[in-house]
Amino acid sequence: MPLGSEERRLLRLIAFLNKNNPYPPVEGTARQRRRARRRWRQAQEQLRALAERIWHSRVEEQLVQAIDQLVLDQQHLAIQQLPDPPSSS
């Protein structure tokens, strides 16, 4: 499925968010490194949740638009009145 301009923009936004949270440096005591990794993991979890919300909101919008289009298409359909079947006598 080719990506549209809106999807590319969302992916660039998500990539930008991930780029701004680099892995912590290997400096400091073991406790400092452990705390830095813990804070980094927490930030990564928040970024993943945010990215998921951003992406799924777009998917939900597309789904709502598709459903609306189906409803409009169905409104144009008309049921034809069929004649009564012949009776066998």
UniProtKB/Swiss-Prot annotation:
Its main location: host cell. A motif (Nuclear export signal) lies at residues 70-82. GO terms for cellular component: host cell cytoplasm; host cell nucleolus. GO terms for molecular function: DNA-binding transcription factor activity; RNA binding. Keywords: Host cytoplasm, Host nucleus, mRNA transport, RNA-binding, Transport. Residues 13-21 are annotated as: Homomultimerization. Signal peptide: none annotated. GO terms for biological process: mRNA transport. Pfam families: REV. The keyword Transport applies. It is found in: Host nucleus, Host nucleolus; Host cytoplasm. The keyword RNA-binding applies. A motif (Nuclear localization signal and RNA-binding (RRE)) lies at residues 29-45. Homomultimer; when bound to the RRE. Multimeric assembly is essential for activity. Escorts unspliced or incompletely spliced viral pre-mRNAs (late transcripts) out of the nucleus of infected cells. These pre-mRNAs carry a recognition sequence called Rev responsive element (RRE) located in the env gene, that is not present in fully spliced viral mRNAs (early transcripts). This function is essential since most viral proteins are translated from unspliced or partially spliced pre-mRNAs which cannot exit the nucleus by the pathway used by fully processed cellular mRNAs. The RNA-binding motif binds to the RRE, a stem-and-loop structure present in incompletely spliced viral pre-mRNAs. This region also contains the NLS which mediates nuclear localization. These overlapping functions prevent Rev bound to RRE from undesirable return to the nucleus. When Rev binds the RRE, the NLS becomes masked while the NES remains accessible. This is Protein Rev.
